[in-house]
Amino acid sequence: MKHYSIQPANLEFNAEGTPVSRDFDDVYFSNDNGLEETRYVFLGGNHLEARFPEHPHPLFVVAESGFGTGLNFLTLWQAFDQFREAHPQAQLQRLHFISFEKFPLARADLVLAHQHWPELAPWAEQLQAQWPLPLSGCHRLLLDEGRVTLDLWFGDINELTSQLDDSLNQKVDAWFLDGFAPAKNPDMWTQNLFTAMARLARPGGTLATFTSAGFVRRGLQEAGFTMQKRKGFGRKREMLCGVMEQTLPLPCSTPWFNRTGSNKQEAAIIGGGIASALLSLALLRRGWQVTLYCADEAPALGASGNRQGALYPLLSKHDEALNRFFSNAFTFARRFYDLLPVKFDHDWCGVTQLGWDEKSQHKIAQMLSMDLPAELAVAVEANAVEQITGVATNCSGITYPQGGWLCPAELTRNVLELAQQQGLQIHYQYQLQDLSRKDDGWLLNFAGDQQATHSLVVLANGHQISRFSQTSSLPVYSVAGQVSHIPTTPELAKLKQVLCYDGYLTPQNPANQHHCIGASYHRGSEETAYSDEDQQQNRQRLIDCFPQVQWAKEVDVSGKEARCGVRCATRDHLPMVGNVPDYDATLVEYASLAEKKDEAVSAPVYDDLFMFAALGSRGLCSAPLCAEILAAQMSEEPIPMDASTLAALNPNRLWVRKLLKGKAVKAG
């Protein structure tokens, strides 16, 4: 699944003000009463009004083909809110809507289309505010304070459904089979789509569609649905409804990357940084009971404790998984931070990455060739850099207009405070020594003879993650680094954006009139003592990259103000998020994996033990989406990521890649 810009919908508005696709010569909704048609066909056809109060689970999942203007989603959301108001004690608490759209509307067209339905304005405005960039892949939108989740998959539905992770199999309670009419858009209405719908449908799941075409009914029956006709809406004579009355066999396509969750809803998190904080929120939103154990006397004393950190995506033309992950992680992070109800120092001032030498210029040229939306990344010539950044550099580069900087320490502290208000229990100065399986959970042994037992455990303790017997073989490494804090000058005060070169320089923080220059890099080190050599090195890298500008030479590090931290990283620059893999069992079970892929069992893991680690230097970008991915996995909910990209986050990936090629694997 190559990551690329998505072509927006090519539409016009007819005399009635209804959007019409020029490419498909079809309306997006009925000229007569599109809202009532949606209520009749999709809500009524799936019997949702009757099913909501009787639903035995806290989450109801709806999937849709063709998001269009979002009319179906907004109508359902309105109905769900009305249900929750009428049945506050019902088991069902949250709505999850998954939709596929090949040609998403431009935001301006979306806003115009929504003017048709003033009664939906409270819901439409929330959707408009979070409308994502036109990037292929999954965009998760958290709406109504997380009670409603919208997964927008941009791209061709027949391609996307073949690339979904197995976590979506048998999760859908109701299908809205929508889109332009089969005669107008035959490429969508395929047997592959019908088969995918059946695979994703939960036993007892339903479907409804406006069409009564015979080939659609027969195709859905062949896929496994029991179909029937129903009176159509308005002038349409008939429509189709269906139910999945059987449990279909579901072979796992890549068992070595299989992910497992739990229905226990109780977990301990080991850590005290941004990963722990954001995962706590994500689990609490799903109704979990969460306890956090932090080795330090306060949060954010490790790698998450910096004053300023840059937020921008890590892009690579030669690594599709890296590009897909960080593009979507970045856009999710911006939406997430904007809606987070806590205060933290930040400025979405933009980030400009500069080509200071031939190698970096070539890298930037390759990134710019990837057909990315201008809202995400755009080229900037040397003569324009000073205009957008405020300082001269004599370098061209790439700018991320939605990037910027934020204070990780303040973010972490305030998110944990919010989580405590929502029920999080926190224990400080609890240094985990070891953990072992006990009955149906985990026994945690802390320094000072303290013990605790929990159903599930998540290790999110940064570079210390490999200190346990279960994790000692993980291929992660520590990186010590020092960030220099420098006072502003008249020239530095002009800096309007974060500059990235062979290091980074932030605009001044109004809270302290200082800039941050970072960071030194010592692979394999866990040293956190101040280093004057590192301080001078941070300054010298800035001068070496911009030798012709005077302001760089005026940077003053003599005050010896700095912060030292240790990051956890991997050689492929991607986080490790998911089940903790069992190294010894993996080598035994997969000894012949290269020759016997068809006989492979599910990946050997430690039951109910998870990890959220190796965020490297891009944790501010990756942590929000990673927290959402892991919380969804642990809760056995749909995961907002395609299978191949999700595999690239699997903690066992580096071992499995070698085993698939018949190569030897070494610990660490």
Swiss-Prot record:
It comes from the Bacteria. Keywords: Cytoplasm, FAD, Flavoprotein, Methyltransferase, Multifunctional enzyme, Oxidoreductase, S-adenosyl-L-methionine, Transferase, tRNA processing. Its cofactor is FAD. Coiled coil: none annotated. Residues 270-668 are annotated as: FAD-dependent cmnm(5)s(2)U34 oxidoreductase. Its main location: cytoplasm. GO terms for molecular function: flavin adenine dinucleotide binding; oxidoreductase activity, acting on the CH-NH group of donors; tRNA (5-methylaminomethyl-2-thiouridylate)(34)-methyltransferase activity. GO terms for cellular component: cytoplasm. GO terms for biological process: methylation; tRNA wobble uridine modification. NCBIfam families: MnmC_Cterm, PRK01747.1-1, PRK01747.1-2, PRK01747.1-3, PRK01747.1-5, tRNA_MNMC2. HAMAP family: MnmC. In the N-terminal section; belongs to the methyltransferase superfamily. tRNA (mnm(5)s(2)U34)-methyltransferase family. This is tRNA 5-methylaminomethyl-2-thiouridine biosynthesis bifunctional protein MnmC. It comes from Escherichia coli O6:K15:H31 (strain 536 / UPEC). The gene is mnmC.
